[in-house]
Amino acid sequence: LRIPCCPVNLKRLLVVVVVVVLVVVVIVGALLMGL
């Protein structure tokens, strides 16, 4: 697996992934609480 870009973009991508995962967890948790 080659990453031709600099680690700054990788760090930004990691932050975006973490935020998306947190949002999904919150939504799923809210749905489970609603049920």
UniProtKB/Swiss-Prot annotation:
Broad class of where this protein is predominantly found: secreted
PROSITE patterns for this protein: SURFACT_PALMITOYL (PS00341)
Annotated InterPro entries: SP-C_palmitoylation_site (IPR018051), Surfactant_protein_propep (IPR015091)
Chain segments annotated as coiled-coil in the UniProt record: none
Any single Gene Ontology cellular-component annotation: extracellular region
Pfam families (UniProt xref): SP_C-Propep (PF08999)
GO terms of biological process kind: respiratory gaseous exchange by respiratory system
Localization per Swiss-Prot or TrEMBL: Secreted, Extracellular space, Surface film
Alphabetic keyword roster: Gaseous exchange, Lipoprotein, Palmitate, Secreted, Surface film
Miscellaneous comment text of the record: Pulmonary surfactant consists of 90% lipid and 10% protein. There are 4 surfactant-associated proteins: 2 collagenous, carbohydrate-binding glycoproteins (SP-A and SP-D) and 2 small hydrophobic proteins (SP-B and SP-C).
Protein function: Pulmonary surfactant associated proteins promote alveolar stability by lowering the surface tension at the air-liquid interface in the peripheral air spaces.
Protein name listed in UniProt: Surfactant protein C
Upper classification of the organism: Eukaryota, Metazoa, Chordata, Craniata, Vertebrata
Gene name of the record: SFTPC
